[in-house]
Amino acid sequence: MWGLRFIQLLLGLCLFGLGAALMVRAHLGLDPWNVFHQGMSSLTGLSLGMISILSGVAVMLLWIPLRQKPGLGTIANIVVIGLSMDLFLVLIAEADGMGLRITYMVVGLVLTGLGTAAYIGAGMGTGPRDGLMIGLNRKFGWSIRVSRMLVELVVLAGGWLLGGVAGVGTVAFALLIGPLVQFFLPAFQEPWRVKTPPV
């Protein structure tokens, strides 16, 4: 059972990386964290995936004063998403024409929601950024929604100022990722009967 959950976790994280790579190739806007990662990548010359990994480690260090404990899923989230994103960015060609760019964005968004549901449903630990929201909730009593909004507004603004791409894809992500995860989650959650909070 543990092995199957771990496989589901890895598949979910790879799907997330694939979805993120497609949204990068669409050039129509990324989710807030990847806008930040893209901006930092432009600034430093490091790959998007490597910046994602370093960012994940930095965010996880913020767990220490919040007394959050990482799980196996937390570590896997940091490493697998970053590596898979870099791999898929090598394999996926640039979109030629607006029709293909929109297709990349839509498919990327759906795969990101599917991947998120898969790794959450495996119940093996939150990602570093989700864990930060939970820690802020426990430490200061802020709602997870408010915590997420504040943190993502900061990273979005910072990433955009550094040259990250924000646009219609960013808005679509903000509006649709929650409903997509909620739609896919039961299929991945039920086999293990893992109780996870709603997105």
Which residues does each predicted region cover?
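Core subunits and conserved enzymes of cellular information-processing
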Residues: M1-V199
